[in-house]
UniProtKB/Swiss-Prot annotation:
Keyword ATP-binding assigned: no
Pfam families noted in UniProt: RimP_N
One GO location term (cellular component): cytosol
PANTHER family attached to this UniProt entry: RIBOSOME MATURATION FACTOR RIMP (PTHR33867:SF1)
Keywords linked to the UniProt accession: Cytoplasm, Ribosome biogenesis
Family that this chain belongs to: Belongs to the RimP family.
Function of the protein: Required for maturation of 30S ribosomal subunits.
InterPro entries: Ribosome_maturation_RimP (IPR003728), RimP_C_sf (IPR036847), RimP_N (IPR028989), RimP_N_sf (IPR035956)
Gene: rimP
GO BP: any one term: ribosomal small subunit assembly
Name of this chain's protein: Ribosome maturation factor RimP
Cellular location(s): Cytoplasm
Lineage start: Bacteria, Bacillati, Cyanobacteriota, Cyanophyceae, Synechococcales
Length: 155
């Protein structure tokens, strides 16, 4: 029942999201709670940041479509939020925003004992990633990089 309910809610909420140039990034139903909690994470279709106003504008129409669908026969709490900042850096914008921040770089070098590098994000080009490790710039070809993520401190 939960999977079918979730799918039906996603279909309805996607239609509402389109009206605001949004998309439903994820929808979770916490049915073990009383009242149940519907957590919806939204994104803008143009990839700009979500504001509190975007969440607020989406809330009432989303609530109305859920109520009018009669899919839920119980009370619920609706939570609308943005995706927030991911620890993993993927977009060009991420690399510009977090230049100088401490990062962990997971490597896929099969013949190397080094699987993780830690340093300050220095530069990203189309071919390589450069990080500052204790004052020395290390350039890592992107074909050797598995994942780049923010970390809380430099080890």
């Amino acid at each position: 029942m939960d999977k079918e309910l979730k799918n039906n809610l996603e279909i309805l909420l996607e239609e509402v999201a389109k009206e605001f140039n949004l998309k439903v990034y994820s929808l979770n139903l916490l049915t073990n709670q009383n009242p149940i909690i519907i957590k919806i994470i939204i994104k803008k279709t143009n990839e700009e940041d979500i504001t509190i106003e975007d969440c607020s504008r989406f809330n009432n129409p989303a609530s109305a479509v859920i109520e009018n669908s009669n899919l839920l026969k119980c009370s619920y709490v609706l939570e609308i939020s943005s995706q927030g900042v991911s620890d993993e850096l993927t977009s060009e914008r991420d690399f510009k925003t977090f230049k100088g921040f401490p990062v962990n770089v997971e490597l896929n070098q099969k013949n190397s004992r080094i699987k993780l590098l830690n340093g300050l994000l220095y530069e990203k080009s189309k071919d390589y990633l450069a990080i500052n490790i204790k004052g020395k710039i290390k350039k890592i070809p992107f074909n050797e990089v598995l994942k780049i993520s923010l970390c809380t401190r430099q080890d």
